[in-house]
């Protein structure tokens, strides 16, 4: 049966998850490069495009839910671009542009999440890029923490914290409600293994901002987000 598609992949210790680009990621790719994606002949403005992105995501998620999926993850590189001053300067974004983009990210994501079933978990992975052990952007989460951690209505954040590019844990103080935070303290970009005592110490540091029972541990990103993989 169609509703068994995801259940067949699960057991007592495993939950099947469907990952996809964040609605904000899709919107950013389309609106940020109109030469590559000329949608003006279809939409009179960005608001019409955004409405269709929201409708498409909601339909896809409804179909996934009908197929038995109860865990969806949005992979999102848009927020970290806003954390990196050099990226903002290269793209010509003023402080006002950055504030507007944060709100646009938040609005499209929350519109997709609104009124979803109570037993559907929606998480997000905030990514700085992961290509052949390189990255797209750097910088701590402070510039986006209030909107991202305080107002995005996901159930959990998967965050990269494997090196100095990620900044410190202080922005986690903005995490609202009972959301979980998955600390990406284990690198997937380099072959060296972490010192377990260092990992424990960093978890204790993060627990100053988010209670320990809402913290989890993971790799910072995938081991092979593209076919080239990483240099491991």
Model regions and ranges:
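Short, small-residue-biased leader/transition segments that mark boundaries at the very start
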Residues: 2-6
